[in-house]
Each structure stands twice: as structure tokens, then as C-alpha cells.
């Protein structure tokens, strides 16, 4: 009997001892994989834990501080759908590291170590956000010298290029709950070199400025359109959004499994895969660098879609204090969407920001060097640190109340008065200020809608006057509209420092068809300028070249501005030309440097010339080349000849040529109404004759037709110029006879 009793007692004790492990073996609850050791939750918000389990089980989340004390807890029950979601109120942010235990019916099934609370942000966009830290200038230096980031910055990494293959299995129709291959780590981990360079510098800078742990959720993919990041229910509930998305919308019926889906552009695909799984986080805001893939579309389309994206993310992340704040990066210089596509998009960003100034900021990037690495192509500038740090600067003003410029300067209002366009800007800091001798980057147009380079002056701390002698009755002005805008030099200025450049600006979107890009050579202020139209080749190139002469940019040769062109003839006949092409060896072809311009809408071309020598010099002609090598020369205004004598008087002379009356390849008979021969200008050559010539050239400018552009477009020519040139030609031929 004693033996039996002893056996029963021993068996009971064994059962009691082993019961937890037996029970634990039957626990099926698990967290979604977006949670992990070393993670960060937004302070003072609900810290939500979600996953799957058996219906009816009680799931508890317990927060344990560094002393072992329970700091917070919350519980819920697994629902009929097999999903649980439990939460507790997150404590104030700080550097204390916590443990979170997840228990099912009292049994531990998950433990998260080294959890902190602070400021959590989401990063999103396409390739310029995705480009990894290791492909940035600073990142490469960090790799070389062993530098790492802060342990107080926590990164949620998700592989930017998972294997989608365009199938419904890999690009699901429904929002997902997990992200393949995701993980959390801090800034001291070697894996930081795989995260977004812009995101890294944003988070590191924000952490230092706030003196608070910062977390960053990653969500970007190169080449992606904005439509891919918007949830389906948002699209289907708003006909304007659905119309703006157009063919990128795909219904469930047509969500094919044959590999034809586009990861980059089809509506909701990337949202389902990379954003929806983050729904239980509570980010304080988002940094966004996207838009290149959406250039070349109608004005206003992107605004419609971005409004939808911001509204849907505000709901998704349960942001309670107005809209989810978003800091947007302007687009870098490149020819996506045409020569002016990127600048039109950034100009729309600027106007979009003013629709919701309390929740949006735009940072400008036009002054940041366009250094690049061949393996990441020229459209991905490698200087990511200034971009990320400017986003952190904007976030401090937008979200955290710092006395910063909240956004880069953008147009507040404009007024046409006394032959000038007056533009008033927001967010100028203490004042607008120019870097250099004069403001570069403004253009102006009349009723013909054709823009020409303009003069500009700051008339008050936030207002600029824009004008041109060649446009007497302006209709609109633009700023930083060209392909390469690094010469644009108007800045917000605060506390004795240049903060960032003014954003691309359009005063009237009705006048947007004939934008002139910054040729770089017309003001003769600089000897080198950055050029890029190739994905693999870009850099600083000479602005001018010569044949039979020495040429250099010199302040002593300036008529206006920082410099002019000093020309020393080495032969009796010589020429100077702007450099318009460079050779792309990889593709074995010439690349035109933001050139190949349509000059049909220009009526006159002028150049300032000074003869510093002792003998007269003749500008024999200006040769304007087409790509096929054929050339024409404009006649001197009011004359039937292409040449002009420059007297040796040491004075500046303005030589004006009529672009509507041209001599063909040296012939002496002019042709009337020949504007169509200027539809694709590939090169320009200024040809001179004179021994021991010593010239200064500066300020090459253009005058437009002045005829409303719809008339010219309809007829294909300028009727006023046609009549004038016919009369001039007849009179000239009579005199020649």
C-alpha cells in the first residue's frame, strides 16, 4: 500500500512539474514576424502586438523594465478569425531597455529583448530612397574607416527586392500581415549598410537633435510609381483617384497569375506587400522620396494621388492628431519625363505642400553635388547625407516645434506689375539671399508662352522681381525649370546661414509648354558645368571650346555678372562655340547636353561684344547647326548680311541677329519665314575674322516672337514675321540687283 501511495505521489509531482512544458507544447500563438528583439515603439502611444493563435485563448503582453518590475500590461482574446491584437500604453521615450513577454493563457510563447521607446518614422519611395548606405559617399567612408551608427537608432529592414515575379502568389491581391526576410537591428550593426542611405542619415540626425531613441521602418522600391503604394479601398472609394491611376488599376477579376503584373506600377501591389504588414505600428511621420516614375503626366495628377496616400496612411496608422506628417524630398536633376519633367514634378510638390502646410514639408536638393557611382547610375546621386539631414531638419520644425524653416521656400503669391513679375515666397527664414553676384535660374515669358532667361532682384525679405528687356509684357515666370539646376542660387537664410535653395516655381501653369532650360553658356559666368543625360556618364564639362583661339571665362571680360568670355585670336580666322555634346563610349554615340533645343519660337538672338585690341574684328557669321551637320546663319537685325564689324574702341556693342531670316550654309540669298529650320538646334558657332584679336563676349540672349503660341502652333509659322521678312527680302533683292 505504501509503495502504491508513493508511486501515486511521485506521478502527481511529475505531472505538476512537467505541466507547463506540456501546456507550452500545445501553445499555437505566435507574433507576426515584423516584431523582434531590439525594436522600437512610438512613445506615449498604444504599443500593439498582433499575431495568430487558437480562438478563445487569452493573450497577454507584459512590459518589464530594467529592474524586473512590470511597467505595463494588456490582454485580449484570440478572435474567431484566429488573430489576436493586444496592447498597452507605451511609456515616455528614453534610453531604458525593456523586455516584453507574450503569454497565452499564462504560458510564455514569445519574449522580446532590448525594446526601447522613442520616435518612430516610416521611410518610403523609390530608388533614391532605396539606395543603400554603402552606395553613398559617406557610407563608403564609414565602411573604409570602420565607423558605425548609434545604438539608439533602431532600423526595421525589409529586403527592397523580394522575388515578386509579377505573379499573384508573390504579389498578392490582399494586404499581407508579414514581410519576408525582415528584421530589426541598431545603428552599430554591420547590416546598416544595407538600409536606405537617406533613411540612415535622417534617423541618425533626428536622434541627436531630439536626444531620444529613433526608429525607422523601411518601405521603398526602385522604379515604383505612387499608385503601387496606395491601398485598394482608397482607390475604389474615390472616382477621382481611380481616374488618376488609370491603367495601373487592376480589379480582382483581372489580377492575373501569368506573370504579367507590374510590381512597380500596378495599384496596391507594394502597399499589400510592404506597408500593410506595418499597420499595428504608430509612426510619428513619414519621409518620402518618390516621383521620378510619375513624371511626364498631367499637372495635378500626383497631388490627387498623394492626397489619397497620405489620407490612407493616416487611417492605417491610427494617427490621431490631424494628418500623418510627411517630409518630401524634391527630385534630383535628371531627364526623366523630358528635360523639365523632374522640375515640373517638384514644382507640383511645392504647391502640394501648401495645401496642407501643417502636415507636409518639402526639402530642396538642387545645390547638393551630383556625385555618382557607375554601378548605381547617374540618376542616383551618392550624396545622401545632406538629403537625410535636411529631412530631419524639416521634421524638427514640422512635428517637434523647433524654430526651423519648416519647408524649403515656395511661391506664396505672384503679381504682374510694370513689366515685371513679382514673386513672394513662403518659408524664407530671416530673408531670401543669393549665393553669388546675381540671381540665376529665373525665366520669363510673354503671351507667346516662350520662356527666356530673366534678370531678378530681391526687393524685400520674401519677394523677388523678375524681368527681361526681351519680354515687355510678361505673363508668367519660372524658377529652376531646367534639367540641371545647380546654378540656381536663391536661398532661404536663417541665423546667419544659408538653409536650402528655393524650390522650382511656376507662377502660371497655363504657360508651361515652352520652357527654356539653363543653357549654361549664355551668361558666360562659369567655365565648367555639370552635364548628364546618360545613365552611365555625367560630370563637369567645359562650357566653351574654340578653334584658332584661346578662350577662358574671366571677370575682366564681364559685361554683367561674375564673368565673361575672354577670346584671344591665334589665327586670322577663328571661332568659339558652346560645348553641346560629349561622347558616350559605352553606347558609341554623342550625347547632347540638355541641348537639341527648338528655337522656332525665338525671334532674335543678341550678344554683347567688346574689342580690346587695336584693330577692328569682324563677326562674320553665327552658324546654327542641325544634327545632320547642315547649318544656317541669321542675318544682322535690319540688314541682309550675316556679318558685323566690331570697332577697336574698347566699348561694349550689342549685336542682334534675326532668327527669322536665315542664310543657308553660306549662301547670300535669304529665306523668309524659315523658323522650321531651327526645330532641332544641335550646335552653335561664332565665327570671327581679324588679326591679333582680343575680344570679350558676354550675355547672349533671346527675344521671342510675341505672338500667342496657339496661333503659331495652328499655322506652323509666325504670320507677322512672315510678312515682315517677305517685304525685307524683296527690298534687299532689289538693292542687290
Give residue ranges: language-model regions.
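Positively charged n-region of N-terminal signal peptides that target proteins for export
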Residues: 1-4
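General helical structural elements
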Residues: 7, 144, 158, 607-608, ...
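Bacterial N-terminal signal peptides
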Residues: 8-16
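Cell-envelope and extracellular/periplasmic
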Residues: 24-518
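Short, flexible helical or helix-coil boundary motifs
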Residues: 12, 252, 704, 734-737
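Beta-rich carbohydrate-recognition modules and glycan-binding surfaces
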Residues: 512-729, 733-734
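Generic N-terminal simple sequence motifs
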Residues: 16, 497-500, 551
Amino acid at each position: 500500500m505504501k509503495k502504491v501511495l508513493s508511486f501515486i505521489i511521485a506521478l502527481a509531482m511529475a505531472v505538476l512539474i512537467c505541466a507547463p512544458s506540456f501546456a507550452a507544447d500545445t501553445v499555437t500563438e505566435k507574433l507576426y514576424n515584423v516584431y523582434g528583439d531590439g525594436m522600437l515603439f512610438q512613445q506615449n502611444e498604444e504599443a500593439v502586438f498582433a499575431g495568430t493563435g487558437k480562438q478563445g485563448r487569452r493573450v497577454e503582453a507584459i512590459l518589464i523594465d530594467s529592474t524586473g518590475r512590470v511597467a505595463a500590461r494588456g490582454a485580449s482574446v484570440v478572435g474567431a478569425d484566429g488573430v489576436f491584437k493586444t496592447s498597452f500604453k507605451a511609456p515616455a521615450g528614453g534610453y531604458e531597455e525593456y523586455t516584453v513577454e507574450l503569454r497565452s493563457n499564462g504560458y510564455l510563447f514569445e519574449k522580446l529583448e532590448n525594446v526601447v521607446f522613442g520616435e518612430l518614422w516610416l521611410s518610403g519611395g523609390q530608388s533614391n530612397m532605396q539606395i543603400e548606405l554603402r552606395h553613398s559617399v559617406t557610407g563608403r567612408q564609414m565602411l573604409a574607416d570602420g565607423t558605425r551608427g548609434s545604438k539608439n537608432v533602431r532600423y526595421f529592414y525589409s529586403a527592397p527586392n523580394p522575388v515578386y515575379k509579377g505573379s499573384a502568389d508573390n504579389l498578392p491581391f490582399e494586404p499581407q500581415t508579414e514581410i519576408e526576410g525582415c528584421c530589426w537591428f541598431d545603428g552599430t550593426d554591420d547590416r546598416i549598410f544595407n538600409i536606405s542611405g537617406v533613411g540612415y542619415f535622417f534617423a541618425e540626425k533626428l536622434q541627436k537633435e531630439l536626444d531620444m531613441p529613433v526608429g525607422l521602418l523601411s518601405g521603398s522600391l526602385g522604379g515604383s510609381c505612387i499608385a503601387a503604394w496606395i491601398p485598394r479601398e482608397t482607390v475604389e472609394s474615390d472616382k477621382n483617384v481611380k481616374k488618376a491611376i488609370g491603367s495601373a488599376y487592376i480589379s480582382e477579376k483581372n489580377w492575373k497569375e501569368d506573370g504579367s503584373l507590374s510590381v512597380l506600377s500596378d495599384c496596391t501591389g507594394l502597399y499589400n506587400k510592404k506597408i500593410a504588414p506595418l499597420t499595428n505600428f504608430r509612426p510619428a511621420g513619414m519621409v518620402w522620396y518618390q516621383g521620378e516614375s510619375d513624371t511626364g503626366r498631367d499637372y495635378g495628377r500626383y497631388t490627387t494621388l498623394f492626397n489619397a496616400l497620405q489620407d490612407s496612411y493616416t487611417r492605417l496608422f491610427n494617427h490621431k492628431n490631424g494628418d500623418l506628417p510627411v517630409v518630401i524630398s524634391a527630385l534630383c536633376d535628371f531627364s526623366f519625363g523630358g528635360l523639365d519633367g523632374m522640375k515640373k514634378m517638384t514644382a507640383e510638390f511645392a504647391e502640394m505642400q501648401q495645401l496642407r502646410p501643417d502636415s507636409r514639408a518639402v526639402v530642396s536638393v538642387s545645390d547638393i553635388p551630383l556625385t555618382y557611382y557607375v554601378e548605381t547610375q547617374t540618376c542616383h546621386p551618392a550624396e545622401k547625407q545632406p538629403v537625410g539631414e535636411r529631412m530631419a531638419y524639416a521634421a524638427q520644425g514640422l512635428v517637434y516645434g523647433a524654430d526651423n524653416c519648416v519647408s524649403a521656400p515656395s511661391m506664396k503669391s505672384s503679381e504682374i506689375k510694370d513689366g515685371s513679375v513679382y514673386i513672394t515666397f513662403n518659408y524664407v527664414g530671416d530673408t531670401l539671399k543669393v549665393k553669388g553676384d546675381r540671381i540665376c535660374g529665373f525665366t520669363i515669358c510673354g503671351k507667346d508662352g516662350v520662356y527666356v532667361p530673366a534678370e531678378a532682384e530681391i526687393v524685400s525679405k520674401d519677394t523677388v522681381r523678375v524681368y527681361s528687356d526681351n519680354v515687355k509684357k510678361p505673363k508668367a515666370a519660372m524658377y529652376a525649370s531646367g534639367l540641371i539646376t545647380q546654378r540656381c542660387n536663391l536661398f532661404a537664410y536663417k541665423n546667419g546661414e544659408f538653409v536650402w535653395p528655393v524650390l522650382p516655381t511656376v507662377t502660371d501653369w497655363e504657360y508651361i509648354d515652352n520652357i527654356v532650360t539653363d543653357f549654361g553658356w549664355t551668361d558666360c559666368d562659369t567655365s565648367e558645368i555639370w552635364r548628364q543625360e546618360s545613365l552611365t556618364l555625367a560630370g563637369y564639362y567645359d562650357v566653351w571650346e574654340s578653334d584658332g583661339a584661346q578662350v577662358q571665362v574671366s571677370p575682366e571680360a564681364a559685361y554683367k555678372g561674375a564673368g565673361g568670355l575672354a577670346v584671344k585670336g591665334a589665327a586670322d580666322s577663328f571661332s568659339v562655340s558652346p560645348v553641346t555634346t560629349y561622347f558616350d563610349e559605352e553606347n558609341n554615340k554623342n550625347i547632347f547636353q540638355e541641348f537639341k533645343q527648338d528655337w522656332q519660337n525665338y525671334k532674335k538672338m543678341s550678344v554683347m561684344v567688346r574689342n580690346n585690341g587695336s584693330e577692328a574684328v569682324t563677326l562674320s557669321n553665327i552658324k546654327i547647326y542641325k544634327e545632320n551637320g547642315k547649318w544656317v546663319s541669321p542675318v544682322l537685325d535690319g540688314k541682309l548680311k550675316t556679318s558685323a564689324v566690331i570697332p577697336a574702341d574698347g566699348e561694349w556693342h550689342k549685336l542682334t541677329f534675326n532668327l527669322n531670316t536665315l542664310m543657308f550654309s553660306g549662301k547670300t540669298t535669304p529665306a523668309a519665314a524659315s523658323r522650321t529650320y531651327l526645330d532641332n538646334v544641335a550646335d552653335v558657332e561664332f565665327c570671327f575674322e581679324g588679326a591679333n584679336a582680343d575680344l570679350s563676349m558676354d550675355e547672349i540672349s533671346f527675344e521671342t516672337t510675341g505672338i500667342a503660341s496657339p496661333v503659331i502652333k495652328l499655322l506652323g509659322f509666325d504670320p507677322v514675321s512672315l510678312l515682315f521678312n517677305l517685304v525685307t527680302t524683296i527690298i534687299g533683292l532689289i538693292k542687290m540687283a
